[in-house]
Amino acid sequence: MRKELCRNFQRGSCRYGENCRFLHPQQAKPNNPFGFGTQNQQQQQQQQQQNSSNPFGFGVQSGGSSRPNQFQNTWSRTASTPTGGGAAASTQQTGKQTQPADHKCTDPAACKRVMQDDFKNERPMWKLTCYGHWKYFPCDVTGDISYEELRAVAYEEAKRGIPLQSIVERERNLQNSKIAEFENFLRNPYKGSVTANQSPFAATTPSIFPQSSQINSPSPAFSGFNQQTAFSNTNAGGLSSSGPPNAFASFNQQTTFPNTNAGGVSSSGPPNPFASFTQQSNNQQTAFSNTNAGGLSSSGPPNAFASFNKQPNAFSVNTPQPVPSGPSGFQTNPSTTFKPASFGPGPGFATTPQNNNIFGQSTPTPATNTSQNNQTAFNFNVPVASFTAPAINTTNTSSGTELQIGGDPVDSSIWLKEKWNPGEIPEQAPPDAFV
């Protein structure tokens, strides 16, 4: 007994479902949900196999087996040199090993090969573009113009009445100039760039120590090794001096600082406030004048930086030129000349009975020898009470360390010691020079 089809089921409004007395035919869903195209049974089976093996629904499968690494990108550019041009740095596939592009920008030859390979294999169809041979470097060829911009300019020129032939000629010249720019860069890729062995500042700045001989004086103040300075051979007072005294060693070079006497004046100028550097000893020029223990020169003015025991300068080789003696510039009656402490127990301030002043005396009186003068003992190890303290007479003996207090000579070496041994502590009060 055949049942009739349920009309309500065909309309989609049957309320009985499976309990309905009429037939509810089961319609097979079409394989093509869009309703176009035909598929046979074999194609349906293949589609089912693909749906089971490939859930993404694309790719060709054979025999129901999945292909390994089906999403792996195995594309590689076949080139002899690594890439580095307008495209991003790609990787080369060798089997299953991926190697990054080896681009050595420090090697000009390698960079040029990369550029040649880029121009050969990756030259774009649109010529009005820019180019950079390395990913993170600035563009080597700049000035890119898009075709939209070129078209917009052509429209604007056409609106202004410019002939079409002129517009085309301008665009052709623009393209030819860009091609020429690329070719020039390929021939000379590093024009205008700074290499590792080239300084960006090509112009050399003049040195204050010129190599050419500018001054005839051969003695330097500090060792200059055959170099001459740009300073003139003058003294500190601005007056020229033709003498070649050396301040701190000489290797037959030009002085770094002006060649002067210590007073800053020439040999015929006013008195020298700090004595002269140009005293001679053993036929050699010394950096400091030869003085006795009192710090006064026997043949010249008082020297603030006196050499001791008449020892010549070990670095001096120049022939000395004696400078006329001059008294100390900072003097009163009696005047005290500032002198550094000696290596021995000698005094540092010397009192000379002179009345010369640096500001009014035209003819200096030469300083007398310390064997005929009394000096004030002073040492830098103790503080200075006053520069105007009353002078204490000293007697220049073999040791040079005796003071006369109340007419009696007193050994002053005991006051120069840093540490006293038992039994050496003096009973009397220290002299004013050591207070």
Swiss-Prot record:
Report the main location listed first in the record. nucleus
Q: Which GO terms describe its cellular component?
A: nuclear envelope; nuclear pore
Which residue stretches belong to region Disordered?
Answer: 25-105, 205-374
Localization: Nucleus envelope; Nucleus, Nuclear pore complex
Q: Which InterPro entries match?
A: Nucleoporin_NUP42 (IPR051767), Znf-CCCH_4 (IPR041367), Znf_CCCH (IPR000571), Znf_CCCH_sf (IPR036855)
**Which segments carry the region annotation 6 X 2 AA repeats of F-G?**
2-88
Record's compositionally biased regions (Low complexity):
39-51, 78-99
What are the sequence repeat spans here? 34-35, 36-37, 56-57, 58-59, 343-344, 359-360
Taxonomically, the superkingdom here is Eukaryota
Record's comment describing the protein's domains: Contains FG repeats mediating the translocation through the NPC by interacting with transport factors.
Return the protein name.
Zinc finger CCCH domain-containing protein 16
Name of encoding gene: CG1
